[in-house]
Amino acid sequence: MSQLSTIIEQAFEDRANFTAADCPSEIRQAVEEAIAGLDNGTLRVAEKINGEWVVHQWLKKAVLLSFKLNDNKPIESCDLRFYDKVETKFSGWTEEQFKAAGVRVVPPAVARRGSFQAKNVVLMPSYVNIGAYVDEGTMVDTWATVGSCAQIGKNVHLSGGVGIGGVLEPLQANPTIIEDNCFIGARSEIVEGVIVEEGSVISMGVYIGQSTRIYDRETGEIHYGRVPAGSVVVPGNLPSADGKYSLYAAIIVKKVDAQTRAKTSLNDLLRAD
């Protein structure tokens, strides 16, 4: 792996010195190997090691290089035609491949090659971008978007119209991460590398970026870029120091309890084989 990452890192530094037409075969092969690893889940842009999230920046660079090395080409889906550099993940898959993967894909859901969906993932008509990792038992509901290189944990529910930010444009240092057993309410947006820690519930219509104040009404503490584990978060406002106006904030109203869990529990019937 160190050799692969070294090739990618060096190629990214030298990217102005070659084109898709004259790219050295070693670089092209390394990029393809990295994308294939992201696609089958053996590689991840970010992973939790000893309780801390570690970002493998070289894999993000591999994704960016793949855009440089591949030309646009027609992509067909029934009567629809597209023109892009990245193939769709499930193009040409057989019934046996879908059964082996254990993923349910509802038309017209789209996942790009280089993204990974683990067993018992359900993709309603949604979009999963390259480099994203969606772990076991998660549902990506209708019109939800999982951005490039985003990391979605086990047994997560991304409700209708949810947006999970990517890293490619505007260029972000770290991916957005939704940890295990989280519930993200309809039309909420989590972006800019924010981490929603395990077991949290985000209400409908909550918008969180790195500069969003996340206010804990019980302790008075303000967090940035991180929703503490087990939080229940709703949209709100905080007053200015002079009391003349208020600005948007995400408010932690309580910790998850049995009542919250009952309202946001996952339905195993929807994930049965």
Swiss-Prot record:
Domain of life: Bacteria
InterPro entries membership: DapD_Trfase_Hexpep_rpt_fam, Hexapep, Hexapep_transf_CS, THP_succinylTrfase_dom1, THP_succinylTrfase_N_sf, Trimer_LpxA-like_sf
Cellular localisation: Cytoplasm
Binding locations of substrate: 104, 141
One Pfam family from the record: Hexapep_2
Gene name of this polypeptide: dapD
GO (cellular component) term, any one: cytoplasm
Catalysed reaction, written as an equation: (S)-2,3,4,5-tetrahydrodipicolinate + succinyl-CoA + H2O = (S)-2-succinylamino-6-oxoheptanedioate + CoA
Stored NCBIfam families: dapD, PRK11830.1
Lineage: Bacteria, Pseudomonadati, Pseudomonadota, Gammaproteobacteria, Moraxellales
Protein family membership: Belongs to the transferase hexapeptide repeat family.
Its EC number(s): 2.3.1.117
Species per Swiss-Prot/TrEMBL record: Acinetobacter baumannii
Complexes and interactors: Homotrimer.
Annotated metabolic or biological route of this protein: Amino-acid biosynthesis; L-lysine biosynthesis via DAP pathway; LL-2,6-diaminopimelate from (S)-tetrahydrodipicolinate (succinylase route): step 1/3
Record keywords, A-Z: Acyltransferase, Amino-acid biosynthesis, Cytoplasm, Diaminopimelate biosynthesis, Lysine biosynthesis, Repeat, Transferase
Record-linked Gene3D superfamilies: Hexapeptide repeat proteins, Tetrahydrodipicolinate-N-succinyltransferase, N-terminal domain
One of the GO BP terms on file: lysine biosynthetic process via diaminopimelate
GO function terms (MF aspect): 2,3,4,5-tetrahydropyridine-2,6-dicarboxylate N-succinyltransferase activity; nucleotidyltransferase activity
Name of the molecule in the record: 2,3,4,5-tetrahydropyridine-2,6-dicarboxylate N-succinyltransferase
